[in-house]
């Protein structure tokens, strides 16, 4: 075919206003959907059956919040009020990554002010993105860091030892997973040995005494736990099948009747039908690409242990990826019941 013949059969594509407007409209709709999704907070309501739950705790409700990061709720907690409405809950638990990547705790303080006004107790653990909770200051003194002190001043409790949520023959314990790897006896002995050093400054001595006190409190709480007690365990990082297969970790997490976790933000970027695109975790198959939903969101059974994973409120990346796609910010209302068929 000659060049002249090709020219005869060449179809000229005419650019019309419609061919420009349709893709542009789709982009605008997508942007609007993303903005809407990121501006709201959805409430995931879950019922978890614990047949041996003490009768006086039947219906006990936990508000689970995770990964606040850069999320703001308004000076009066308006965003929380809009989502929760008239919902009732007995306690609030927060499972880490509570301050922004820049170390800003404004969102956390707004949330704590809101719950303090409602006189609801709040317990929190930290995530890998949170600054330390204690420090030796420049003047040599030891104490809470600024963000942790802000939380404590608002009535929140840093959960570094198990706490019984009720009295009675069978207790329901709230327990931080991080402390279960401790060998308290050897840890206390090691700290006692360090205290023999006469060259320690006052801040270091106070830091050691604080840690020793927490280890002793942990040992006391564990000694009070009975075999038939129930345990809700808080962990920032969700437990995976792989992480539950060693004898040590299986022994740790078998203590829990229910694990509450966060961290992955549901993948942050999700695709319709396919789910989460990627999650940062070296233990996940495929290097974290298209991770199993059991580790991303909701109530699932992981190696014979029930675990609820919140998709959280914030984002794991800075600009321009500080948005969520097909995955709106979430808080969760978990009701415990004695009913087996709940």
Residue spans for each PLM region:
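N-terminal membrane-anchoring alpha-helices
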Residues: 1-56
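A short C-terminal boundary segment appended to hydrolase-like catalytic domains
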Residues: 3-13, 19, 311-342
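Acidic/histidine-rich helix-loop elements
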Residues: 35-37, 62-78, 98-106, 131-142, ...
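Beta-strand-turn-beta hairpins that frame and shape the catalytic cleft
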Residues: 49-63, 156, 162-176, 181, ...
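Membrane-embedded segments
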Residues: 60-157
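Active-site neighborhood of phospho(di)ester-bond hydrolases with catalytic His/Asp-centered motifs
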Residues: 63-66, 91-97, 121-128, 159-161, ...
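Binuclear metal-dependent hydrolase catalytic cores centered on His/Asp/Glu-rich metal-binding motifs
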Residues: 134, 145, 153-155, 168-234, ...
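Conserved beta-sheet core of the metallophosphoesterase superfamily
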Residues: 238-329
């Amino acid at each position: 075919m000659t060049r002249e013949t090709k020219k005869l059969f060449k179809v000229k594509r005419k650019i019309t206003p419609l061919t420009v407007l349709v893709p542009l409209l789709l982009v605008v709709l997508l942007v609007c959907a993303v903005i809407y999704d990121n501006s709201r907070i959805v409430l995931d309501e879950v019922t978890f059956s614990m047949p041996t739950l003490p009768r006086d705790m039947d219906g006990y409700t936990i508000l689970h919040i995770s990964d606040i990061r850069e999320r703001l709720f308004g000076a009066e907690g308006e965003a929380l009020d809009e989502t929760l409405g008239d919902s009732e809950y007995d306690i609030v638990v927060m499972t880490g990554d509570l301050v922004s990547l820049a170390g800003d705790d404004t969102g956390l303080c707004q949330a704590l002010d809101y719950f303090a006004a409602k006189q609801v107790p709040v317990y929190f653990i930290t995530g890998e993105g949170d600054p330390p909770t204690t420090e030796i200051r420049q003047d040599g003194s030891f104490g809470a860091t600024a963000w942790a002190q802000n939380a404590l001043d608002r009535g929140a409790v840093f959960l570094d030892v198990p706490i019984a949520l009720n009295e009675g023959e069978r207790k329901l314990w709230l327990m931080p997973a991080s402390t279960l790897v401790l060998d308290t006896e050897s840890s206390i002995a090691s700290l006692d040995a360090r205290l023999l050093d006469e060259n320690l400054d006052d801040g270091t001595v106070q830091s050691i005494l604080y840690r020793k006190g927490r280890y002793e409190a942990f040992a006391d709480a564990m000694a009070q736990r009975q075999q038939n007690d129930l345990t809700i365990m808080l962990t920032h990082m969700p437990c995976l099948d792989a992480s539950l297969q060693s004898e040590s970790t299986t022994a740790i997490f078998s203590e829990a009747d229910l694990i509450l976790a966060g961290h992955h933000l549901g993948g942050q970027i999700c695709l319709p039908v396919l789910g989460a695109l990627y999650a940062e975790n070296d233990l996940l198959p495929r290097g974290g690409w298209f991770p199993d939903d059991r580790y991303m969101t909701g109530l699932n059974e992981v190696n014979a242990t029930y675990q609820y994973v919140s998709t959280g409120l914030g984002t794991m990346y800075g600009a321009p990826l500080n948005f969520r796609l097909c995955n709106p910010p979430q808080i969760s209302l978990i009701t415990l019941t004695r009913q087996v068929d709940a």
